[in-house]
Amino acid sequence: MRPLRMVAPPGPEPLLRVRDVTLQYRSGSATVRATQNVSFDVFEGDRFVLLGPSGCGKSSLLKAVGGFLAPSAGSIELAGRTVTQPGPDRMAVFQEFDQLPPWKTVLENVMFPLLAAGRLPRAEARERALHWIARVGLTRFAGAYPHTLSGGMKQRVAIARALAMQPKVLLMDEPFAALDALTRRTMQEELTKLWEEAPFTLLFVTHSIDEALVVGNGILLLSPHPGRVRAELNSHQFGLASGGSAEFQAAAQRIHDLLFDEAPAAPAPGERATR
C-alpha cells in the first residue's frame, strides 16, 4: 500500500501584485526614470510600507497603483485585474492639507465620493459618512468647514472620506509628514486603532524609518534614484510602544544600513535582499 502524501493547501493570493515595474515620466525635455524592476506583493489586511530616501520613486509607485501613472515596463494587478486607470477601489490620502474642497463641510466632504460614484442614495451616504466621522472622533465638527480645522483634523477627515468608500486598498502618501511631532504620533496611533478595529489593506509611503516600523507589518526598502528593491522585511513585532526598545533601535539601524550602504549587507533572518 502506497503511503499517503500530505499536500499543503495553497496559500492566499496577493490582493495587490506589482511585477518588475519600471516607471518613467517627462520633466521638461528629459525623461526621468523613477523606479526600475520593482516587484512586491500586498495581501489583504496588510499594512505595507514603501520606504526610501527622497527621489526613490515611492510616490510614483503609489500613483501607479492608483492608476495615475502607467508603467513603462512590468505590470500591476489588483484582485487579479490589471490596473489601467483610477478607480474607487483605491482611495488616497496625501500630506497636503488642501485636499478637502474648502466650500464643503466635513460631512459633505466625506459624502462627496460616495455620491459621485453613485454607490448609495443620499440618505445612506449620509449615514455611512457620519459613521466614519464618528470613527475618527469628529462628530462635533461634522458641520465645520476645512479652514476651521487643524492639520491633524483635516487628515482625519481625509482618512474618513477614503475609508467610507470601503476601498480594496487605502493609499497614503506621507500623510503625516507636515504635522508636528506630537500630532504625527497621535495620527499614527489613530490609524493603527482604526486598523485594529476593522482591518483594511494599507499601502503607505514614508521616508521615516521609525514611522515605517510602527505603521507597517511589512516594509519594502527602495534604493536612491532610480528606485530598486534593496530588501523586504517584516515589522509586525513593533508598535508605538516599541520605540525605546533595543530591538526597535537595532531594526532601525539595520534598515538605515540597508538603505544607504553602497553594498547592502547580507539579509538577516526574515529579510529578502535584492540587487
Which role does the model predict for each range below?
Residues R122-F141, K193:
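Conserved ABC ATPase "signature" region
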Residues G66:
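Helix-to-loop junction immediately C-terminal to a conserved catalytic motif
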Residues W103-F112:
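Short coil-to-helix segment of the ABC ATPase nucleotide-binding domain corresponding to the Q-loop/switch region
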Residues A164-K168:
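A short, proline-enriched helix->beta-strand linker immediately N-terminal to the Walker B motif
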Residues G74-P86:
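Conserved ABC transporter NBD signature motif
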Residues Y145-L149, M153:
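Conserved ABC ATPase signature
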